[in-house]
Amino acid sequence: MEIKPSRIFSTITIFFLCLLLAHVTSKASSSSLCNGSVAECSSMVETEEMSVIMESWSSQRLTEEQAHKLSYGALRRNQPACDGGKRGESYSTQCLPPPSNPYSRGCSKHYRCGRDS
């Protein structure tokens, strides 16, 4: 069974038009909640905007506070933060990441190194 591309396009177009219609009607119904004066409606909108700002601010503060806390696993005794290495080595030797671009290139003829001259 073969479906024509024009049929798929029309189906997708109808679907998005339905979504657009639902979005527009929901916006229209939410904006028609205020039946008072312009001042009353504007103060109601400002209050709603302020509550959204306050919610985002408080959630941002909570995430910032949680980012600075240590986990209980980090507080265990005799547990190095990294692999630790051999006995007698400092714990921090294994914490360094491997070099991102180690030098592994040879000497080309262009540079006329001592061995190629």
From Swiss-Prot:
List of glycosylated residues: N35
Post-translational modification, as annotated: Proteolytically cleaved, probably by S1P, a subtilisin-like serine protease (subtilase).
Signal sequence segment: 1-26
Keywords: Disulfide bond, Glycoprotein, Hormone, Secreted, Signal
Region annotation Disordered: where it falls in the sequence: 77-107
UniProt keyword Signal present: yes
GO molecular function: hormone activity
Record bears the keyword Glycoprotein: yes
Propeptide feature: residues: 27-64
Disulfide bonds: C82-C95, C107-C113
One GO cellular component term noted in the UniProt record for this chain: apoplast
InterPro entries on file: RALF
Site residues by UniProt (Required for proteolytic cleavage): Q60, R61
GO biological process assignments: calcium-mediated signaling; cell-cell signaling; regulation of growth
Pfam family for this entry, one: RALF
PANTHER family in UniProt: PROTEIN RALF-LIKE 32, RAPID ALKALINIZATION FACTOR-LIKE
Function, as annotated: Cell signaling peptide that may regulate plant stress, growth, and development. Mediates a rapid alkalinization of extracellular space by mediating a transient increase in the cytoplasmic Ca(2+) concentration leading to a calcium-dependent signaling events through a cell surface receptor and a concomitant activation of some intracellular mitogen-activated protein kinases.
Record-stated family: Belongs to the plant rapid alkalinization factor (RALF) family.
Protein name: Protein RALF-like 32
Protein species of origin: Arabidopsis thaliana (Mouse-ear cress)
Source taxonomy: Eukaryota, Viridiplantae, Streptophyta, Embryophyta, Tracheophyta
Gene: RALFL32
